[in-house]
Design a protein with these regions (language model features):
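Hydrophobic alpha-helical segments at protein termini of multi-pass membrane proteins
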Residues: 1-236
Length: 236
């Protein structure tokens, strides 16, 4: 039964994000765009080690200051900072670096597609790393496509920043994704659940929201493709 749940978790974590990637990739027929999408996926798949590296830096801070011995506070640091913040920083950095490195007349929708694709690659890579995790955790993350949702929000905010020159939406989108990610992980921590099992409802609720948001992403893609505000190349 456990093996079946693990297999189900892997499939569930792959199918929605792969479908989203295909949908984004097929927005344009031009070879240059499809090449960018392929490269963005590769960057995402290879981004897990960079995430582990930054988490390692935060882990050193955790050890030096004995944060891991601070009970619930230590668990909050581990889940919200060491894991969630490190991963969101790495994915966002690699996404922005990618768009700077590869010259292309990006539209707002292009930036959303590239940014989401980088996180899709990260999500697929992480699902392989998480093979030893609790099956229920894999199922929750798989059904809700958490990283894809985080990446979409950040990419939308970055695209808004590039479109308007106003950085606040980008900052708010990053903070939203980080807290969404961090609180989800923290809600499943042993230290918090030891106080009351009902705290698991926090993570379940955030996973349900992510599932609903994943559906919204699939609705958003074809609608945005018909709007000039999203498809017109950004000139700054």
């Amino acid at each position: 039964m456990t093996i079946l749940l693990i297999v189900a978790g892997i499939l569930l974590s792959s199918v929605p994000v792969v479908l989203a990637y295909i949908r984004f990739r097929n927005l344009k027929d031009e070879a240059a765009y499809k090449d960018l999408m392929t490269k963005a996926m590769i960057v995402g798949l290879l981004s897990c080690p960079a995430g582990f590296l930054l988490s390692g830096v935060f882990a050193i801070i955790e050890r030096v200051f004995h944060i891991n011995e601070m009970g619930l506070l230590g668990a909050a640091y581990h889940k919200i900072i060491l894991l969630a913040l490190a991963e969101e920083i790495v994915k966002t950095f690699l996404f922005i670096r990618f768009t700077k490195k590869h010259s292309y007349p990006y539209s707002w929708l292009d930036l959303i597609a590239i940014g989401t694709t980088v996180t899709i690659g990260f999500e697929i890579g992480e699902s392989m790393v998480m093979l030893g995790s609790e099956p229920i955790v894999m199922l929750l993350r798989g059904i809700s496509a958490m990283h894809m949702c985080f990446g979409f929000v950040i990419a939308w905010g970055y695209g808004k920043y590039q479109k308007t020159g106003k950085i606040l939406p980008f900052v708010l989108c990053f903070l939203l994704s980080w807290l969404w990610h961090g609180l989800y992980d923290f809600g499943l921590s042993e230290e918090l659940l030891a106080l009351n099992d009902n705290f698991a409802a926090l993570s379940i609720s955030l996973a349900v929201i992510a599932f609903a948001y994943m559906i919204y992403i699939f609705i958003f893609i074809p609608k945005a493709a018909k709007k000039e505000v999203y498809t017109t190349p950004i000139i700054r």
